[in-house]
């Protein structure tokens, strides 16, 4: 099984983060379950690090930059290597329609860049966006919109 950190994160998201379970499992019990599901210890550790990084970024004091409607995000060469034109266009679209604000966009880009995935595509980006929005207070409508988009596409693939 060729899995990466994103596969572990998607597994956790689908089974735990998106559920209304009252008692959350411990990190140790999750590690055991993920190992039994076939994930490698190294990838499990990296996934937990990724989630801890997300939590730290969300707890830190947000830096507010003056942003106008005519502002354009310039991507670095490294970001362009990870996020192809389709991914960058999708982020721009989400920002233009009001699903993302500039702070959330930057948080998403940071979390994408923290992944070691070599073949990162639009479907992966949608999952990262969904995971980030699920942890953002006040982003319930944006999360619901992305959840519909991601899970409608998944169910279309299954039928």
Curated annotation (Swiss-Prot):
InterPro entries the record matches: Smg
Pfam family, one: DUF494
UniProt family annotation: Belongs to the Smg family.
Record protein name field: Protein Smg homolog
Organism the protein comes from: Nitrosococcus oceani (strain ATCC 19707 / BCRC 17464 / JCM 30415 / NCIMB 11848 / C-107)
Organism lineage string: Bacteria, Pseudomonadati, Pseudomonadota, Gammaproteobacteria, Chromatiales
Gene designation: smg
